[in-house]
Amino acid sequence: MRHGSIPGTRGHVRPLALLGDPVLHAPCEEVTDHGPELARLVEDMFATMYAANGVGLAANQIGVPLRVFVYDCPDDEDVRHVGHVVNPRLIEADGVVLRGPEGCLSLPGLEAGTERYDRAVVEGFTTDGEPVRVLGTGWFARCLQHECDHLDGGVYVDRVSGWRHRRVMRQAARAPWNRQRAPEPR
């Protein structure tokens, strides 16, 4: 991505993988080639995220099992954070654990109270292979943890238990986008 360009303006919107798609439930592979295809992938990810009104998107959510995510997310002070991380590692998640509403572009229209730390630090690389360290607090910390979970083969409903889990899984089973892909409620 060129410095100063608006992310996603040159990208193409790709279809989203939905809950139950195997690509969402398997760990993603490390990126080994920082060439032009990676930059195009990131542009497509931004375009897809913006088209779906999201604040974050992992590569496996568009069917690409690589360790990459993009974000355009505010923190609790309404400071906007925009960027991408290649081969991210969640190196810190600490502070207060808060249960808050969490949704996902791969479960459109659904949300559940999900516990997350209110501070997170992610390290990785840019599309050019330059090291990057991202610190998030509040809502942005939630976003960073959510996207890292995706790359490890998880979705937020995996972190929800009890009646909240049963409720969101029932809602997923009844959702118009579900074509018998969602796992049965436990």
UniProtKB/Swiss-Prot annotation:
The keyword Hydrolase applies. CDD domains: Pep_deformylase. This is Peptide deformylase 2. It catalyses: N-terminal N-formyl-L-methionyl-[peptide] + H2O = N-terminal L-methionyl-[peptide] + formate. Its EC number is 3.5.1.88. The active site is at residue 147. Gene3D superfamilies: Peptide deformylase (3.90.45.10). PANTHER family: PEPTIDE DEFORMYLASE (PTHR10458), PEPTIDE DEFORMYLASE, MITOCHONDRIAL (PTHR10458:SF2). The gene is def2. Its cofactor is Fe(2+). Belongs to the polypeptide deformylase family. It comes from the Bacteria. One of its GO terms (molecular function) is peptide deformylase activity.
